C-alpha cells in the first residue's frame, strides 16, 4: 500500500504543489509520526505538550485517509470489473489528492492558522522558515506561557525582598549568625592558645622538661603500685610461713605420742606430712615473689630519684637560658627606647618646633598686618576729622593695658613692689613716643620684646618659712600640694632644657627595664 501511495505521489504536478503549499504528501504523513516520536524523546520538558498536540493533529488525516483510500480503491476495482463508468454528474471536479483531505482538516489549517508540520530532516527543503503562527489557546493546566513570566519575575529584583532585608527578624538572624561565629572562635581560642604555648615551649626547650614531668608522674604511680605489691606479697609470705609452722608443731605433737596412735592419728599424720610439703613449696614461691617485688620497687624508686634530679638539672639550665634571653631582651628594649628617644628628640621635635614657630610667625604677621591696617585707618580718619593723635592714643592704651596686666599678675603671684616698678619702668623706657603715624607695627613689636625681657628679669622672692604650729599653714600646704598634683596633668606650657629631657628619658627607660626584669625573674622563680 505504501508503494501505491509513493507511486501516486510521484504523479503530482508542479501546478498541484503550487496550488496546495500547505498540504503535505501522504508518505510524509506516514513517516511523520515516527520522527515526531523521536523528537519527543530528545526535546525539552516544556515542549512536550506542544509536540503531543502536533502529533494528534498529524494523526487526524490518517484516520480519514486509510478508509477513504480503501473505499475508493474498492469502488474503482468494482467499476472496472463491471465496466460501469461512473456517472458524469457524480464525478468530482478535484483531484484525488485534494479529495483525500477532509474539509474539516482544510478548515483547520486555513482558518485557525496552525503551525506548519515540518517534514523529516532528510526530506526537508532548504527554505527559510516561516514565521511561527499564533498557537491555539490551551487549557489552564497546560499553559506554558506562564513559565517565562515566572522567569521574568525571578530575574527582576523584587522590592519586597529589599524591604524584608531591613526587617527586625532579618537583622536578628544576621546578629545570631555573627554571635555563632564569635562563639565558634571563642571555642577554638583555647585550642589555639594551647598550640601557641606548645610552640613556645618547643622553641625555648621546655617540652623536654614537660616530658620529664610526665615521666616522673608515671614513675610515682609505678612506685606506689610496687610498694602495694610488696606489702601484699609480704603479707602472703607471712601467712604461708605461719601455716607451715602450725602444721610442723602438730606433727611434732603426734610424733611425741607415736606409741599411742590410733588409725585416725595415722591418717592425720599422713595428711599433715603431705600438707607440710605443700606449705614448703608455697613458702618458697612467696619468698621468690616477695624478692621480685622488692627488687621492682627499688628499681622504680631509683628511676624516680634519677628523673627528679634530671628534671631539677634541666630546669636550672632552662632558667639560666631564659634569664640570659631576658637580659638580652631588656638591653634590646632599652636600646629601642633610646633609639626612639633620639629619633623623637633630634628628628621629630625640631620638625614640630619649626612647624609651631612657622605657625606662630604667620599668626604674628597676620596680627601685625591687622594692627597696621587698623592704625592706618585710624590715622586716616583722624586726619579727615582734624586730629592726628588717634594712633598715639591707641599705642599708649595698648602699652598701659600690658603694664596693668603685668602688675595684676605680680600681685597675684606675690611679687614685691620693686619688681613691678622695674617691669613698668622697662616697658615705659623701651616704648618711645612716636611722632609719626607710619610705623605702629614696629613700635608694637619693640614693646612686646621689652615685655619679654622684663619678664625674664623679674626677681624671684623666697616664700615665707612654714609654720608647723599654725593650722592655716597646713591647710595652705595641702591646697598647694593639691594644686601641684592637678598641675601635673594640666596643659600649661613650660620651658625645659634638652639635658633635663634626656636625663628624664634615660631614667624612665632604666626604671622600666629594671621593673620588667624584676617581674620576669619573679615569675620564672615561682614557676
UniProtKB/Swiss-Prot annotation:
Going by the UniProt record, its keywords in alphabetical order are: Coiled coil, Membrane, Mitochondrion, Mitochondrion inner membrane, Transit peptide, Transmembrane, Transmembrane helix
Q: Where is this region: Disordered?
A: 109-171
GO-annotated biological processes: inner mitochondrial membrane organization
Q: Where is the composition biased (Pro residues)?
A: 117-128
The topology of this chain with respect to the membrane is: Multi-pass membrane protein
**A Pfam family:** She9_MDM33
In the UniProt record, does the keyword Cell membrane occur?
A: no
Q: Which residues lie on this side of the membrane: Mitochondrial intermembrane?
A: 349-502
Query: Which residue ranges are assigned to the Mitochondrial matrix compartment in the record's topology?
Result: 524-527
TM spans (from-to):
328-348, 503-523
Do you know which InterPro entries this protein is assigned to? MDM33_fungi
Show the GO cellular component annotation of the record. Answer: mitochondrial inner membrane
Domain of life (superkingdom) = Eukaryota
Please note every region of biased composition (Basic and acidic residues). Answer: 129-144, 151-171
Subcellular compartments: Mitochondrion inner membrane
Q: Give the main location.
A: mitochondrion
Q: Which residues form a coiled coil?
A: 277-308
Subunit info? Homooligomer.
- What family, per the record? Belongs to the SHE9 family.
What this chain does, per the entry, is described as: Required for the maintenance of the structure of the mitochondrial inner membrane. Involved in mitochondrial morphology. Causes growth arrest when highly overexpressed.
Q: What is this protein called?
A: Sensitive to high expression protein 9 homolog, mitochondrial
